[in-house]
Structure formats: structure tokens, C-alpha cells
Amino acid sequence: MSSLLQGVNLYLIGMMGAGKTTVGHLLAQELGYGFLDTDNVIAQAAKKSINEIFAEAGEAGFRQIESDVLAQVCSYTKLTVATGGGIVLRRENWSYLHHGLIVWLDVSVDILYARLAADTTRPLLQDDDPKGKLRSLLEQRTPLYSQADLRICVNAEETPEQIANKIMQVIPSVLKQTTAN
């Protein structure tokens, strides 16, 4: 598989709580790739949590830092990259993402809410109606997420290993399509 990918990065996109980091680690191991989580890179570089960055710089400031990190990441190869849920909001980020294969982990609001209900580290969910906020964010972002090279629909029963296997099985067909064009 990694010879078929020829070092091309995999970028995992999708909502917070979709499983990008967990599945990304598994894909990296399977491919012999390195793994990066853009939120972790941002937090380590800033020596602050994502919550603190949001509080100090606002969402716009955070999104700029996120774009700067993505610009640097795309210059590397053989990486599986878990991105922040809102990385698709900035047009410039798509030019970076298109350096690799973009995989959308498509997860329903109900599953996301079940996974995130107790998570207090998500600044965009500090809302009176977190489930409604998730629904609103997903509605806003779905047209953007749908631009991915590969859409993986995730159900509640699937394990991260099953999701990673599903991705590995369909990568060859996506690569054939992109090389044929």
C-alpha cells in the first residue's frame, strides 16, 4: 500500500470527535508513516491548550495559526495527519490539503454528541445547547467536507481498527481515479 501511495500524505478531516486522531495513529502504523495531529502541534508550539489559544486569539487567530501549521506540514511526505474539525473553513487550507489524499470521517451528530458530551476541552462546544451547536457546525461544514477524495461513513458499532481497515481497502480505487484524470 505505501508503495502505491508513493509517500503521499493522508489528511483526515471531519468533525471534532470523529476519531481522526485514533484512526490516524492506526493508519500511520499500517503504512509505516509518521503521525501528526495539527491541534497537538499547535498546542505544543504555543505552549498553551487549544482552549487558551481560542480565549486569547479568538477563533480567527486560531484558524490563522492552524493554516500556518498546515502549510509547514504539507512540505513533508509519508505522514498521516489528523486535522482540526474547522480546518476546511479556510480556502487556503484546501490548497495545502490537496498535496495529499483527503479522507473525510463522516460521523452523525448523535454519535459525535455521545462521544463529546463529557469533554470540556472543546471551545466551540461551550454552549447552552452543545448538541444543537454540533448539528449547526456539521450542517455548515458538510459541503466543505464533501470535497474530500474519500468519504468514510462511520457507524456507532465500528471500532477504530475497522474504520482504518475500511480506509485501507478503498485507497487503491481512489488513487486509480486520481491518476486516470
Swiss-Prot record:
Its cofactor is Mg(2+). Its EC number is 2.7.1.71. It is an enzyme of class 2 (transferase). ATP binds at residues 17-22, 122. InterPro entries: P-loop_NTPase, Shikimate/glucono_kinase, Shikimate_kinase/TSH1. Binds 1 Mg(2+) ion per subunit. It catalyses: shikimate + ATP = 3-phosphoshikimate + ADP + H(+). Mg(2+) binds at residue 21. GO terms for cellular component: cytosol. GO terms for molecular function: ATP binding; magnesium ion binding; shikimate kinase activity. Keywords: Amino-acid biosynthesis, Aromatic amino acid biosynthesis, ATP-binding, Cytoplasm, Kinase, Magnesium, Metal-binding, Nucleotide-binding, Transferase. The keyword Nucleus does not apply. Pathway: Metabolic intermediate biosynthesis; chorismate biosynthesis; chorismate from D-erythrose 4-phosphate and phosphoenolpyruvate: step 5/7. It comes from the Bacteria. Substrate binds at residues 39, 63, 85, 141. GO terms for biological process: amino acid biosynthetic process; aromatic amino acid family biosynthetic process; chorismate biosynthetic process. It is found in: Cytoplasm. Pfam families: SKI. Belongs to the shikimate kinase family. Catalyzes the specific phosphorylation of the 3-hydroxyl group of shikimic acid using ATP as a cosubstrate. Monomer. PANTHER family: SHIKIMATE KINASE, SHIKIMATE KINASE 1, CHLOROPLASTIC. This is Shikimate kinase. It comes from Trichormus variabilis (strain ATCC 29413 / PCC 7937) (Anabaena variabilis). The gene is aroK.
